[in-house]
């Protein structure tokens, strides 16, 4: 069996978000050779910095490509904006075959025609007004400098059929499509034209993309057939929706890969979440890319919308944090956090992070609670601490002095001296020492708080501190 070649072909007009990151992931998992192509024909919006960002995002996710550009400098092999001569050759071939023609209709004329068709209950498609202009009329209009698009001629009796690897048999009637634009009036190629040409010339054998591109497929298949170019297999994956059922957007939870990285998500967490958005894996464990690739089956891709839930992402983040090696976890922390953690408590602090934190900012908060004097108690937390009374804290100071290194002995001494137990013991103690009512085990906190700092925090709730 020949190698399956897939591709990811983003437009560098912004940052990569979850939807196109999942497309890239499924494309990488669903083939033997993964190609990156830059579709930058929108010259006004395409930016070199977005190319650099998307390459950085893909590499961070572990999705390196076997073929494609290695830098943001435009390369005619992989950047569509540099392949105009190639597309021009195929435009000429279509015109010579009589399968494409110039259209001089203005945007206003097309809009009027569209409204008339909609008003009469018909689906809007091109009327064919310029389809049979005499050659001398076409020449005259060109000489007058009239702008023209180039349209592909679609026979009304043409039927396009193909087997979608996700959605099954597909059938489109030519009369429902109409003659469509393959080159804009400014000379730039239409998306589905250069997209199809490049897929053929680059040997792409499987195209995985969002279901919103399904309607482009019959157009591309007609173009490829007209030019005797090979056609790939198509797999149109479900779209991602937010928790409100609407397409995922900034409004309902979408974030860029760059934003997730800056928030401290591990790439393994993002990849595992994306891999299960619309695809089933038997394993519920955090899987590496080799295991995800081994378990990927295009027949397991669902047709229903894939619902994004940030709690699922955070679940995978928790597994990634808990499974991270010490050195990885240490360098995941903010530089400022590492600076305040004493070497003697590094291993213990990392153990605390694994059990209690999802993000570096949370770890930073605990580092400052444990290793600095930056503790401030909110009014409700202070009220819990104060409710225990002065005698409780005097007893705690005595117990800590007696058992500075043994939390179990400290706790037994505090119980004996104060008579407190259960929540009346643990809640005020936690509130006074950490400024919180939940968090890491008190035994870990007791071991990491240096004893002068611990004594000062307990003394804050005695009359001696006033």
Curated annotation (Swiss-Prot):
UniProt superkingdom: Bacteria
Coiled-coil intervals: none
SUPFAM superfamilies in the record: An anticodon-binding domain of class I aminoacyl-tRNA synthetases, Nucleotidylyl transferase
Reactions listed under catalytic activity: tRNA(Glu) + L-glutamate + ATP = L-glutamyl-tRNA(Glu) + AMP + diphosphate
Gene Ontology annotations of biological process type: glutamyl-tRNA aminoacylation
Gene Ontology cellular-component annotations: cytosol
Cell compartments where the protein resides: Cytoplasm
Obligatory cofactor(s): Zn(2+)
Positions with a binding annotation for Zn(2+): 103, 105, 130, 132
Gene3D superfamilies registered for this protein in UniProt: 1.10.10.350, HUPs (3.40.50.620)
Main localization, broad class: cytoplasm
Keywords: Aminoacyl-tRNA synthetase, ATP-binding, Cytoplasm, Ligase, Metal-binding, Nucleotide-binding, Protein biosynthesis, Zinc
Residues engaged in binding ATP: 250
Details of cofactor binding: Binds 1 zinc ion per subunit.
Enzyme class label: ligase
Motif position, 'HIGH' region: 10-20
Sequence motif 'KMSKS' region, residues: 247-251
GO molecular function, one term: zinc ion binding
Enzyme Commission numbers on file: 6.1.1.17
Function: Catalyzes the attachment of glutamate to tRNA(Glu) in a two-step reaction: glutamate is first activated by ATP to form Glu-AMP and then transferred to the acceptor end of tRNA(Glu).
Record's subunit section: Monomer.
Protein family: Belongs to the class-I aminoacyl-tRNA synthetase family. Glutamate--tRNA ligase type 1 subfamily.
Name recorded for this polypeptide: Glutamate--tRNA ligase 1
Organism: Methylococcus capsulatus (strain ATCC 33009 / NCIMB 11132 / Bath)
Organism lineage string: Bacteria, Pseudomonadati, Pseudomonadota, Gammaproteobacteria, Methylococcales
Name of encoding gene: gltX1
């Amino acid at each position: 069996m020949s190698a399956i070649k897939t591709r990811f072909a983003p437009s560098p007009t912004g940052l990569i978000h979850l939807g196109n990151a999942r497309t890239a992931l499924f494309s990488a998992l669903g083939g033997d050779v993964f190609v990156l192509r830059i579709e930058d024909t929108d010259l006004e919006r395409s930016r070199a910095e977005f190319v650099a960002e998307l390459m950085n995002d893909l590499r961070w996710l572990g999705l390196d490509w076997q073929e494609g550009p290695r830098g943001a400098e435009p390369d005619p092999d992989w950047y569509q904006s540099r392949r105009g001569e190639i597309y021009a050759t195929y435009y000429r071939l279509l015109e010579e075959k009589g399968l494409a023609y110039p259209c001089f209709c203005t945007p206003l004329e097309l809009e009027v025609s569209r409204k008339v068709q909609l008003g009469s209950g018909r689906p809007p498609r091109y009327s064919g007004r310029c389809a049979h202009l005499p050659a001398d009329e076409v020449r005259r209009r060109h000489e007058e400098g009239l702008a023209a698009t180039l349209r592909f001629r679609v026979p009304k009796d043409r039927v396009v059929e193909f087997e979608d690897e996700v959605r099954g048999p597909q059938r489109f009637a030519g009369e429902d499509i109409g003659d469509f634009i393959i080159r804009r009036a400014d000379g730039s190629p239409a998306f589905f034209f250069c997209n199809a040409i490049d897929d053929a010339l680059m040997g792409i054998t499987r195209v995985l993309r969002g279901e919103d591109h399904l309607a482009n497929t019959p157009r591309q298949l007609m173009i490829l057939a007209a030019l005797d170019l090979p056609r790939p297999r198509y797999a149109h994956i479900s779209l991602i929706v937010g928790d409100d059922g609407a397409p995922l957007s900034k409004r309902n939870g979408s974030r860029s890969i760059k934003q997730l990285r800056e928030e401290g998500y591990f790439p393994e967490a993002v990849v595992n979440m994306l891999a299960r958005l619309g695809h089933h894996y038997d394993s519920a464990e955090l899987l590496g890319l080799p295991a995800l690739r081994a378990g990927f089956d295009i027949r397991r891709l669902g047709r229903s919308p894939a619902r994004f839930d940030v709690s699922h992402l955070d679940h995978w983040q928790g597994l990634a944090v808990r499974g991270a090696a010490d050195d990885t976890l240490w360098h995941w922390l903010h530089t400022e956090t590492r600076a305040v953690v004493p070497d003697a408590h590094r291993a213990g602090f990392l153990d605390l992070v694994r059990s209690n934190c999802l993000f570096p900012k949370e770890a930073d908060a605990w580092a400052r609670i444990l290793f600095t004097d930056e503790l401030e108690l909110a009014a409700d937390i202070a009220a819990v601490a104060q409710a225990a009374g002065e005698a409780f804290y005097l007893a705690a100071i005595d117990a800590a002095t007696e058992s500075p290194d043994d939390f179990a002995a400290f706790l037994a001494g505090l119980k004996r001296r104060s008579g407190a137990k259960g929540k009346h013991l643990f809640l005020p103690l936690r509130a006074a020492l950490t400024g919180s009512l939940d968090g890491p085990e008190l035994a870990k906190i007791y071991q990491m708080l240096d004893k002068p700092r611990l004594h000062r925090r307990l003394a804050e709730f005695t009359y001696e501190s006033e």
